[in-house]
Curated annotation (Swiss-Prot):
This is Secretory carrier-associated membrane protein 1. The chain crosses the membrane at residues 156-176, 182-202, 218-238, 262-282. Residues 177-181, 239-261 are lumenal. The gene is SCAMP1. The modification N-acetylserine is found at S2. It comes from the Eukaryota. It comes from Sus scrofa. It is a multi-pass membrane protein. Interacts with SYNRG, ITSN1 and SLC9A7. The modification Phosphothreonine is found at T45. Functions in post-Golgi recycling pathways. Acts as a recycling carrier to the cell surface.
Amino acid sequence: MSDFDSNPFADPDLNNPFKDPSVTQVTRNVPPGLDEYNPFSDSRTPPPGNVKMPNVPSTQPAIMKPTEEHPAYTQIAKEHALAQAELLKRQEELERKAAELDRREREMQNLSQHGRKNNWPPLPGNFPVGPCFYQDFSVDIPVEFQKTVKIMYYLWMFHAVTLFLNIFGCLAWFCVDPSRGVDFGLSILWFLLFTPCSFVCWYRPLYGAFRSDSSFRFFVFFFVYICQFAVHVLQAAGFHNWGNCGWISSLTGLNQSIPVGIMMIIIAALFTASAVISLVMFKKVHGLYRTTGASFEKAQQEFATGVMSNKTVQTAAANAASTAATSAAQNAFKGNQI
């Protein structure tokens, strides 16, 4: 009670046990109850310090972005462009064939009106001898066979040039070896003989076979061309005293003179090339022959028809028949008189 009698001007909390600093510190740390909650008080917690977050590696999203594809209309446009280009190409080819057929038709009309004039060999107008054959690949030969016929024509020319060079090769060999006069003479004979004969005997039948689809002419070509191939092989071999600068003759000439031997080796290589190309083209022509529908039966029919329609044969048969009839009538008349 003595405390109540103390100085009224003294601090009232001085002796208050609830104002003890240790007690107030504990009570301050206790969270306030619901009855002491004040919604208007500033109860925000202080912001946390700068906390370092762990580095998380970036991952791709769960939904992958689809790859970029060309839209469907682009593919359609490309296909349409390709189809249009193919159509244009076919149209150009058809127009080219139509123009070629038109040109051939006009040429055939001109030939029917003015007649077909021979144009091969191409000789000058003032030459005493005129052309002997008519040759025009674009007019006579179908388009699919023109290349083959032209190659055979160039092969004939190649062999003719080789025979011409063979003359000079044998002449050079004759100059270094006087005993080779026989080869030099035969080389001239082979050039004068084989050049026209090969043109008439196998090239013209081939030309006519493709022109008129003649089975008989195909068989004539095959028979003669086999012989021609054998000639090419013999010329490439070059036996002595046969008039050919083949491999055997070239080696002999090389032992006598190196320049002459080299010249003869070149000619032997040309003969060998002729033989190889001839074999290849024979197979090609035979393959084309099988696609044309030609046969041995058709060849027999064409031969029989050609023989019977030949004016010379008809005249000879008529003369033979008239002679036989006359002799028979005379014998019968003599028998009646006896």
